[in-house]
């Protein structure tokens, strides 16, 4: 492999929606940082068989609904 072109791999903590934490090697963040998941196999309707739950963390869905309210979306 060519030197200096590949990102550095390091250990990070991944926090699932139920609070469990596990370690993985990743290029995300810095060594020891924690990535908190908003959706994972424990909470996703595709794996749980439940109804879809809309997570509007950035307000994008609300903005879309307000913009196109007259169209009946």
From Swiss-Prot:
PROSITE patterns, per database record: RIBOSOMAL_L31
RNA-binding keyword on record: yes
Pfam families cross-referenced by the UniProt entry: Ribosomal_L31 (PF01197)
GO molecular-function terms, A-Z: rRNA binding; structural constituent of ribosome
Coiled coil: none
Keywords for the protein's UniProt record, in alphabetical order: Ribonucleoprotein, Ribosomal protein, RNA-binding, rRNA-binding
GO cellular component, one term: ribosome
Gene Ontology BP terms: translation
Residues of the signal peptide: none
Protein's UniProt keywords contain Transcription: no
Family membership: Belongs to the bacterial ribosomal protein bL31 family. Type A subfamily.
NCBIfam families: L31, PRK00528.1
Functional note: Binds the 23S rRNA.
Self-association state and partner proteins as the record states: Part of the 50S ribosomal subunit.
Name of the protein described by the UniProt record: Large ribosomal subunit protein bL31
Species name: Cereibacter sphaeroides (strain ATCC 17025 / ATH 2.4.3) (Rhodobacter sphaeroides)
